[in-house]
């Protein structure tokens, strides 16, 4: 009778560990050019210094390798099922991170401060949660003005530029919010920048805060995002 060997977690380590930090893949993120996968935070930090894949050395992108990254949710779920307690550990660490940086929704940013809802609508009492159970972040949306820039006359500053929203909100959603608030056509193209760098539409506020803004130091709060009419460099 054939015997069946019970597989151990270590049998799969080569597929579920990050070659940069040597730990289990956290938010596994694949490089689309070569499909090598790393922890999201590891590969983002690597691309701050290099535009080559740390595994095979292929040039990922000449100017912005971050655009060539894709989160692998399927692999993430597989890893969580293979490694007992990993999901709970990561959720706890993430919660502690946001608590430490005072980004959880636990009060106003300043005396009697008023914040706009990212939905751009008043609460109608219908029970929509707008991700209110998520960790929250306060941001400042500032209009970036360049003298003589085309389209500047219709892109104004917001009356209430401080808002609080979920850390999972993407730049694409921020752009839609700005179009609503500024009464711009839904097809109007805007650039959203952090520290002078244009952010991709799929970047979340959490991602931007961790990889771009927190370099300013703990005292730099809230996070400032600037917007302007889109500039076509082509």
UniProtKB/Swiss-Prot annotation:
Major subcellular location class: nucleus
Gene Ontology MF terms: zinc ion binding
Location relative to the cell: Nucleus
Region (Disordered): 97-130
BP term (GO), one: nervous system development
Positions of disulphide bridges: none
SUPFAM superfamilies in UniProt: RING/U-box
Pfam families: RAWUL, zf-C3HC4_2
InterPro entries (UniProt xref): PcG_RING_finger (IPR051507), RAWUL (IPR032443), Znf_RING (IPR001841), Znf_RING/FYVE/PHD (IPR013083), Znf_RING_CS (IPR017907)
Zinc finger (RING-type): 18-57
Keywords from the UniProt entry: Metal-binding, Nucleus, Repressor, Transcription, Transcription regulation, Zinc, Zinc-finger
Gene Ontology, cellular component aspect: PcG protein complex; PRC1 complex
Gene3D superfamilies the record matches: Phosphatidylinositol 3-kinase Catalytic Subunit, Chain A, domain 1, Zinc/RING finger domain, C3HC4 (zinc finger)
Assembly and binders: Component of a PRC1-like complex.
Role of this protein: Component of Polycomb group (PcG) multiprotein complexes; the complex class is required to maintain the transcriptionally repressive state of some genes.
Protein name (database record): Polycomb group RING finger protein 5-A
Lineage of the organism: Eukaryota, Metazoa, Chordata, Craniata, Vertebrata
Gene: pcgf5a
